[in-house]
Amino acid sequence: MFKLLSTANPKIQKGTDKGYLSFILHLAPADVAGYNTCPKATAGCKAACLNTAGRGGMFKRGETTNVIQKARIRKTKYFFENRSAFLDDLTADIMKAVNFARKRGLKPVFRLNGTSDLAWEKYGIIDQFPTIQFYDYTKILGRKIAHLPNYHLTFSAADGNDADVAEALAQGMNVAVVYDKIPEGVYSADEDDLRFLDPEVGIVGLKAKGKAKKDTSGFVRRTIPILVDKQAA
């Protein structure tokens, strides 16, 4: 139905209980496709990237890729190598998605950086839909989105970007922090993907999932002591 967008994400589907249907664009992260889609990527976030979560991480025996990964690489190359056609297709997808959601009595919302961190405010897409909500996570400070009241950004904490986190908080942004266990009193961002609905609480918590559970880079903030095998040490 859609050339570029999808809704096949369990967490995104939780938003339907609140009357929203999220559509997401998944590109290949970092430099996986030969183009850098995550200019502020860190070693920790690369290792724990949700690019290989769910079906994206299901590989047949002996294989290192699958149809999901191939599709994300193909879309990424399309974006960088035929930008105008890509943006035309994305615009058409958004229009279809708006109609799809509204026919089902839901509000369409869009996250264009499902597994990337591109400055979508530069490409004239969000401007075309001023009454539609867009939202993303980002590690890039200082993005110019004041002219786009329908675009919400949540800053992402990672290994080695504590100074940027402090600046983002000073600018009034919410910051998503991945924990092994979300501390008591920290607002949980795990209930849905609708970050634009979050109260302005500063820190919003996400629980480590998949590969992130084994992170030792500092990407995942530890609230539970790591047990060390003394015999292996």
Where are these regions (language model features)?
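Class I S-adenosyl-L-methionine
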Residues: 1-233
